[in-house]
UniProtKB/Swiss-Prot annotation:
This is Cytosolic carboxypeptidase 2. It comes from the Eukaryota. InterPro entries: Cytosolic_carboxypeptidase, Pepdidase_M14_N, Peptidase_M14. Residues 330-601 form the Peptidase M14 domain. The keyword Mitochondrion does not apply. It catalyses: (L-glutamyl)(n+1)-gamma-L-glutamyl-L-glutamyl-[protein] + H2O = (L-glutamyl)(n)-gamma-L-glutamyl-L-glutamyl-[protein] + L-glutamate.
């Protein structure tokens, strides 16, 4: 009907432009509710706005203007500026309340839009949504029985086969630089052409896919190369790829050629997984175990010095032109997690006791979700008494069985069963279902986009490199300050052992709590006897695993800290022996985990005590078995406290994650610029003990030679001269030394051996120090040149500064101590060391103009005794001031002269008691130039063939005592 022909037209309501503007403004920003028309327009509607003229500008404001002023004042208040408050009209009163949190994925829950996964910028991704149905096979899937005749196809050389599929490698040496939603668009590759209609078509550029290269080496044979973890050159275990253009009834052979683990469950009956889209659509069949002639073996290739291994199997596709998938384990992607979380929080009953929020963002920007599950508390006191339980999973992206156990755990704890309700009323659950979403998305097996294993970096302080680990640890640390955390468990997968088992930490606290950490795994083994193997549990704390979540949480104070490991294979227990695990089996372990929590925290402690007594019996049996293997017997009074339980267990190793421990990939190049020094290999204990024994043997040999050899100075000089280059020069010096030895013979009786207390002084030098010819001649100084010492009044009258000897390469230099004994002097008493003073006193006594020594007669007088007075040396205290009067008289009247000890060491040996013999200390070599008298008994001798720059001294018939030591 045309509006122009209408006779009963409604009167048009013309609102004030200002009111209309304010109405739309408030409605846009959420401050205007618009419940009823009368509430929307509080101001009266005017047909036209009154024009204010100059004549009526002085009139009082109208009622409308006053209300507008009130609106403007209210809008400026902080309450209205907040976006977290919403005002509601309840019974005529305006009540503010908090705004509901935003939807999980930043959109309304009605439109069904989800946040897409973010990929590294360089990763190509196909635009295809891949999903699989869940299916539990009616019959149990039996292990493959190896016959021993399985073929081992050799790896063909490069360029031999036809490449039918290839993507870019894992970017070894690079690092993560950025991400984008949905990844990069796929580009056409020339080398991915199908040679004929019978060739299979491969694809892995989808979420969690992993296949780098496929090469056709036979009519129906293909060699496959897996992509290593992104930004690394390691960890090839997980595979998941698509195959198209299949032919029914044709035996195809697939061989993966770059696996890195030395052993695998494929040699114990594990089969690969197959998924057929036609079977899923027509028969409702999902993932199932298939394959024949399965063999895991070592091939001829290597990578970075490590051998590579191959996995081969044959298979017949069930349909023609089918789309099939092969996988190492049941895939569970990041999108699968989002779908499961979406379905749970959309349930109104579930959302009442389950709150979901984002813990943090990963390196690529993907959300790491945190679920808080507990029943609402009626009062604050009840809520404060609740204890906490922390459960995490999927820190290793290739261990998808951990996600399936997590799915079973969430299905049970969020259900409406009475046991689940009791758990929610008793505990607060903090759940992180996927710790490493980036690795899951790109198809890694063990690492994140940092190129490192997250389960080795719980102690790291690099928040930006390991955000999920850092925030998870901070969350637990904050939770511990608020309430007690009775259990922490991280769900994992294991590739070398069957069944399900746990790794824990031995308690080192009070003896009453011993073995308590083993009670929960024992209870779990009783709840799942056909899947969980308690004997497979280990509780050893290894230093190489200190960065794991299990040990880090244990050190923070959580006694029951575990990792629950589920095999990639199946069970070897009970009626499930030699059968594969299905997704339903893995989810059932999550149910059993919750049942065990109820048993462990039951107020009735009868189960707890029964398990503890059984544990004591099992441990005693293990001890007896261990003692029997060692050939020892146990005493009757033997207790568990007499041994360390860790000694009974083997290592929990089975993974090579330590190879991916260290700095993130983007910091490795930076660190190498600052630290170029080559890392030294750490020696084992056996190597260290061997080196220690050899070093001690060499030191003992040197000490023995220093004590037994009668001429140490000549021996050292001989060794030093033999090292010089030139045969003639070497022979001349050896002849010269031999000639000198003939002229200056030494008797065995005139040599003083080294004291046992001086043994350590010879071990400071790494190499034997050489002694010059000049020093050797000084050591051979005859006693007749010294004569009798009667008085030295003017020697060392002033205090002089002692200059320390310079060290040689950080080693203490050998010091020469010469003890000159007259024939009429008594021997030195034992326990009294010679006076040690620096610098050496004999450097200036040599007369360079001739070969004969001269000694000043005016220095030594026969009318005074040396012991009549004490005298000071340069920089040290007097030595004779403490001698008693009787002893002094004996010394003065003694007709037997005393010994004279001359020492060259800069260190002064101080004793509690004063010296008992008079000593003379020479403070400076300047006082000895021309002081010593000429010898009366020794004739003048000259050494032919010896230059004057190295003076030699004649032999004497008097007693000579020469002592060379190293201090």
């Amino acid at each position: 009907m045309c509006p122009a022909l209408s006779t009963d037209l409604k009167q048009e309501v013309l609102t004030d432009p200002y009111e209309s503007f304010m109405h739309h403004h408030l409605q846009y920003y959420g401050y205007f509710r618009g419940l009823e028309p009368r509430e929307q327009f509080k101001l009266p509607v005017q047909r036209c706005r009154k024009v204010v003229t100059d004549s009526d500008s002085d009139m009082p404001s109208s009622q409308e203007d006053q209300k507008k002023l009130v609106y403007s004042l209210l809008l400026d208040s902080p309450v209205f500026k907040s976006r977290q408050l919403v005002f509601e009209d309840q019974e005529g009163k305006i009540i503010p309340r908090l705004r509901e949190p935003k939807d999980l994925y930043g959109s309304s829950s009605q439109d069904g839009c989800w946040q897409q996964a973010r990929w590294p910028s360089e990763c190509e991704v196909i635009k295809q949504d891949i999903s699989h149905i869940e299916w539990d096979p009616t019959d149990r899937e039996i292990f493959y029985k190896p016959t021993g005749n399985e073929p081992k196809p050799p790896v063909v050389s490069e360029g031999t086969g036809a490449v039918v599929y290839e993507i870019s490698p894992a970017h070894k040496g690079s690092y993560f630089k950025g991400s984008r939603t949905g990844g990069r668009k796929c580009s056409h590759r020339k080398n991915q052409k199908v040679q004929c209609n019978n060739d299979l078509q491969f694809e892995s550029r989808f979420e969690s896919g992993n296949l780098q290269k496929a090469m056709k080496v036979g009519m129906y044979e293909y060699e496959l190369t897996l992509r290593t973890d992104l930004y690394t050159s390691k960890h090839t275990q997980w595979f998941y790829f698509q195959v198209k253009n299949t032919r029914k009834g044709v035996p195809y052979r697939f061989t993966i050629t770059n696996l890195m683990k030395t052993n695998s469950l494929y040699n114990e009956g594990l089969k690969p997984l197959l998924y057929s889209q036609q079977d899923a659509a027509l028969k409702g069949i999902g993932w199932r175990r298939e394959g024949k002639d399965i063999k895991y073996y070592k091939n001829t290739r290597s990578l970075d010095g490590r051998s590579l291994y191959s996995l081969t199997w044959t298979f017949e596709f069930p349909h023609d032109d089918d789309i099939c998938y092969f996988a190492h384990c049941y895939p569970y992607t990041y999108s699968d997690l989002q779908r499961d979380l979406k379905s749970k929080i959309s349930d109104p009953a579930c959302s009442h006791y389950c709150k979901l929020r984002t813990l943090c963002r990963s390196l690529a920007g993907n959300s790491i979700y945190l679920l808080t599950i507990t029943s609402p508390s009626t009062n604050l006191t009840t809520g404060a008494k609740k204890k906490a339980i922390v459960v995490t999973a999927r820190v290793h992206p290739g261990e998808t069985n951990g996600s399936w156990m997590m799915k079973g755990f969430l299905d049970f704890i969020l259900s409406d069963s009475p046991d689940a309700q009791l758990l929610r009323d008793t505990f607060i659950f903090k759940v992180v279902p996927m710790l490493n979403p980036d690795g899951v998305i790109v198809g890694n097996y063990r690492c994140s986009l940092s190129g490192r294993d997250l389960n080795r970096n719980y102690k790291s302080m690099l928040k930006d490199a390991f955000p999920c680990i850092w925030h998870t640890r901070s969350m637990v640390k904050r939770l511990l300050t608020e309430r007690e955390v009775i259990l922490y468990c991280d769900f994992h997968g294991h590739s070398r052992k069957n069944n399900v088992f746990m790794y824990g930490c031995n308690s080192k606290g009070h003896p009453l709590t011993k073995l308590h950490e083993r009670i929960f795994p024992l209870m779990l083994s009783k709840n799942a006897p056909d899947k969980f193997l308690f004997k497979g549990c280990k509780f050893k704390v290894q230093k190489s695993k200190e960065g794991t979540g299990r040990i880090d949480m244990w050190k923070q104070g959580i006694q029951n800290s575990y990792t629950m490991e589920a095999t990639f294979g199946g069970s070897t227990l009970g009626n499930r022996k030699d059968t594969h695990f299905t997704t339903q089996d893995l989810k059932s372990m999550g149910h059993h985990f919750c049942d065990t929590l109820l048993d462990y925290c039951d107020p009735d402690s009868s189960k707890f005590k029964l398990c503890l007594s059984e544990l004591q019996r099992l441990v005693e049996e293990d001890i007896r078995e261990k003692m029997k293997q060692l050939g020892r017997d146990m005493d009757s009074d033997f207790t568990l406290s007499d041994i360390t339980l860790s000694d009974l267990e083997s290592s929990t190793s089975g993974s090579n994650s330590s190879e991916s421990d260290g700095l993130p990939a983007h910091l490795v190049d930076i660190a190498e610029k600052f630290y170029q020094k080559k890392k030294r290999r750490l020696r084992s204990r056996k190597e260290r003990n061997s080196l220690y024994q050899k070093r001690n043997a060499r030191q003992k040999q040197k000490l023995h030679e220093a004590v037994e050899v009668s001429e140490p100075a000549a021996h050292i000089v001989r060794n030093e001269l033999t090292k010089s280059s030139g045969k003639r020069k070497k022979e001349q010096k050896v002849a010269k030394i031999k000639f000198q030895e003939d002229l200056v013979p030494q008797t065995e009786e005139n040599l003083t051996t080294a004291a046992p207390t001086e043994k350590s002084s010879m071990l400071y030098s790494r190499k034997p120090e050489s002694v010059s010819m000049k020093t050797q001649m000084i050591n051979s100084l005859p006693t007749s040149c010294v004569r009798d010492f009667m008085d030295l009044d003017h020697v060392c009258e002033r205090q002089m500064t002692i200059r320390p000897r310079p060290s040689a390469n950080g080693n203490r230099l050998p010091l020469i101590i010469t003890v000159v004994q007259q024939s009429t002097l008594p021997p030195v008493p034992k326990g009294i060391s010679a006076l040690k003073q620096h610098p050496p006193p004999f450097h200036s006594i040599l007369d360079q103009s001739g070969d004969q020594l001269t000694v000043a007669d005016h220095v030594f007088r026969r009318d005074k005794s040396v012991a009549k007075r004490g005298f000071s040396s340069a920089g040290i205290r007097p030595y004779c001031s403490g001698i008693s009067g009787e002893k002094q008289k004996v010394l003065d009247g003694s007709i037997v002269p005393l010994d004279l000890h001359l020492s060259l060491s800069p260190e002064v040996h101080r004793q509690n008691k004063p010296r008992q013999e008079p000593l003379i200390t020479l403070g400076s070599t300047e006082y000895f130039e021309g002081f010593l008298p000429k010898p009366k008994t020794d004739p003048v001798r000259r050494f032919p063939g010896i230059s004057s720059s190295e003076p030699h001294f004649p032999n004497s018939s008097e007693d000579i005592t020469v002592r060379n030591t190293m201090k």
